Amino acid sequence: IRLSLVGSEMCIRDRYEGSLWSRGILPQDTSKMLRDERGGHVEVDESSSLDWDTLRARIKQHGMRNSNCVAIAPTATISNIIGVSACIEPTFQNLYVKSNLSGEFTVVNDYLVRDLKKLGLWDEVMVADLKYFDGSLSRIDRVPSELRELYATAFEVEPSWLVECASRRQKWIDQAQSLNIYMSGASGKKLDDTYKLAWLRGLKLSLIHISEPTRLRRI
């Protein structure tokens, strides 16, 4: 809406005419276009709860200032610097040492620390356990099961759920999203299943590298 207002107050972007925006096609409409192009084989929930027709009409009348509005880029290093989670990424580990060109620094899940302190469980033994188990709570029995589930690390989250979440986001994104898929004990079948699921959900995947969880130290 804001970019449509800017387009009406200033001017629309170059080469607006002929774009998807000028034809009243919003990001969530493109899954149907992909289905028509494929002749089916796109399993995406296309339901919505807001009045998008009004926005379509406004954009067709006033245009858009930008060619794209939303893109989700990799944010791992930035999030570490400012002390927040990495946007759409699952937590890599609850405690680990990160290495990059600037050196090495320790990353701790502050939200986990807060919850463990409330339960009186944050102590030197807990820190030692997290180091020993590579930042995972799964084998620390004194941590309540609900916390172990809540703070599951990236390699403990089933990859299919990451794909499902990406699919639900993508229909509202007009550019693209960057998402890492983590696999513990990756196999040819696991990779094939993940690629096929992503394809059915209207996503694209690119394989950059595969690393085992215990060996993944450089990020």
What are these regions (language model features)?
Residues 12-14, 209-210:
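Short amphipathic alpha-helical motifs in flexible or low-confidence regions
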Residues 55:
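Glycine/serine-rich anion-binding loops at beta->alpha junctions
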